């Protein structure tokens, strides 16, 4: 039986980050991935040779002078120079269309720039806009982990932990469209404004408002960069393999791990970066309290997406990289609530990008993500990929047609798009091996205690987008927090402050 220092389960950005940090400290690591390819939701797929992203579409945290929090984390991992961010135009990062109001709004980058633009465009709400942004800024300043060197301290509780985003917005402003603009980025973590704490909204949206960027080669850019450096270290990587059983539990520690390929290994500790309910299914129930099991089972999935993937052969505008949202109403809570088994005409994001196909030829891609709900496909939840009944494929066709119709109506530059493929929440569930097919793991509800750090078994840890905060930055931070715990604060602080690490982050 082979022995490792650490096992990391899941090869998304959280798993890759944890494996890299531990290997940088000379630890032997076994990285396990249940799928056939590495990357989790970062991994791309290709249809007709055209690349599309599954779960990574854009991010914040990059800056022109490479001092953003994502720049710094990638610098510490030694891969920042391997990844090329592609910035959306600062003056027009995101266009939001309101069909019911017969208007649209262009959102720039930069929190202070956004603040001044909103005050100019909503003059009667100037004082409320200032109050909102001052409160927003106070949350950011009270959270040291948004700065790389603050990662040696877990975020402390503040009053905004127990106040919803909706409460703060309602307190500050009254214009319905302005309320929607202030809360619109909740679609980037799949939780309604009346459910999420104001603090968590600030932490997720902060970097997205400062700068907005894609990455050359999309999610594969992160995966390829990190896998390349992992292969140079003391890391064994196995695909199509996960943990089947945590065995030989003594003194609240797992001493033997039985893998799905039939082999057995041992390790000092294991870090799970997969969905909390998948972690719970792997751990021995007799060693877990009913309270812990109930807490994990009570987690609700975040909203999902129904996605249309398309291509434009000869775009009229030359194929600019754009992000456009279509919001049918101004009430985000209502739009992000499932009212029927088959919701249509919901909130939607449409991303256009320039890519290269398998032969290296330029292609112009379109990804349209309409908010969906995991219950929408509940009637087919016990069916398998490519073995579903005709009714399911009729549903996919009708919903895809509806999305294309809306794009043609509201986004003229997409009228020449041809549909390449579509995906429902079941597609995401089966492709990503998560329980529900939700877009962002668990719903980030106020007052909820996520599963992060050490679990009831003393050498089992949890990280990932459901642990701390969703998104690339939140998932990476969760792994850094766990690694600090495993390596010790003094060692980890020296690591963060070392010249060799930070020189590549500057």
Q: Which residue ranges define each predicted feature?
A:
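N-terminal glycine-rich phosphate/pyrophosphate-binding loop and immediately adjacent elements
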Residues: 2-134
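Rossmann-like flavin
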Residues: 100-196
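A glycine-rich dinucleotide-binding beta-alpha-beta segment and adjacent secondary-structure elements
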Residues: 179-189, 409-469
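Helical element adjacent to the flavin cofactor pocket in flavoenzyme catalytic cores
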Residues: 203-254
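Mid-domain catalytic core of redox enzymes
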Residues: 214, 244-361, 503
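C-terminal segments that line or cap access tunnels to active or ligand-binding sites in enzymes
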Residues: 315-423
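A conserved FAD-binding loop/helix module that cradles the flavin
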Residues: 465-487
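Active-site-proximal substrate-binding core of FAD-dependent oxidoreductases
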Residues: 488-506
């Amino acid at each position: 039986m082979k022995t490792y220092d650490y096992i990391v389960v899941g090869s998304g950005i959280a798993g890759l980050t944890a494996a890299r940090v531990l290997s940088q400290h000379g630890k032997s690591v076994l990285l396990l991935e249940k799928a056939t390819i590495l990357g989790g939701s970062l991994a791309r797929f290709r249809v007709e040779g055209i690349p599309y992203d599954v779960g990574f579409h854009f991010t914040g945290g990059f800056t022109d002078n490479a001092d953003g929090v994502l720049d710094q984390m990638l610098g510490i991992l030694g891969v920042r120079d391997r990844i090329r961010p592609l910035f959306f135009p600062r003056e027009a990062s995101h266009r939001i269309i309101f069909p019911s109001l017969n208007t649209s709004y262009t959102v720039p980058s930069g929190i202070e720039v956004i603040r001044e633009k909103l005050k100019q465009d909503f003059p009667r709400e100037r004082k409320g806009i200032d109050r909102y942004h001052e409160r927003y800024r106070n949350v950011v300043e009270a959270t040291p982990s948004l700065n790389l060197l603050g990662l040696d301290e877990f975020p402390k509780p503040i009053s905004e932990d127990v106040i919803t985003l909706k409460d703060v917005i309602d307190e500050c402003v009254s214009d319905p469209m302005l309320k929607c603009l202030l809360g619109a980025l909740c679609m980037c973590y799949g939780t309604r404004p009346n459910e999420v704490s104001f603090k968590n909204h600030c932490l997720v949206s902060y970097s997205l408002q400062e700068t907005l960027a894609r990455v050359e080669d999309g999610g594969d850019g992160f995966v390829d960069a990190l896998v390349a450096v992992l292969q140079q270290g003391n890391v064994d990587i196995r695909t199509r393999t996960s943990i089947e059983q945590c065995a030989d539990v003594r003194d609240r520690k797992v001493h033997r791990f039985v893998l799905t390929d039939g082999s057995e290994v041992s390790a000092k500790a294991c870090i799970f970066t997969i969905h909390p309910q998948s972690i719970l299914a792997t751990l021995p129930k007799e060693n877990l309290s009913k309270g812990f099991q109930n807490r994990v089972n009570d987690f609700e999935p975040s909203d999902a997406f129904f996605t249309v993937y398309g291509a434009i052969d000869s775009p009229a505008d030359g194929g600019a990289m754009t992000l456009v949202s279509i919001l049918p109403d101004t009430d985000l809570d209502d739009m992000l609530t499932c009212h029927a088994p088959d919701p249509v005409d919901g909130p939607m994001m449409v991303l256009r990008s320039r890519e290269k196909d398998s032969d290296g030829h330029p292609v112009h891609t379109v990804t349209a993500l309409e908010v969906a709900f995991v219950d929408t496909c509940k009637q087919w939840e016990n069916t398998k990929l490519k073995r579903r009944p005709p009714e399911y494929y009729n549903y996919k066709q009708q919903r895809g047609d509806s999305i294309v119709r809306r794009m043609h109506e509201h986004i003229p530059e997409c009228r020449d798009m041809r549909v390449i493929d579509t995906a429902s929440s079941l597609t995401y569930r089966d492709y990503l091996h998560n329980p529900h097919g939700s877009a962002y793991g668990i719903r980030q509800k106020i007052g909820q205690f996520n599963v992060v750090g050490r679990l009831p078994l003393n050498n089992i840890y949890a990280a990932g987008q459901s642990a701390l905060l969703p998104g690339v930055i939140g998932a990476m931070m969760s792994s850094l927090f766990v690694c600090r715990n495993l390596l010790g604060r003094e060692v980890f602080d020296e690591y963060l402050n070392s010249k060799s690490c930070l020189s590549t982050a500057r």
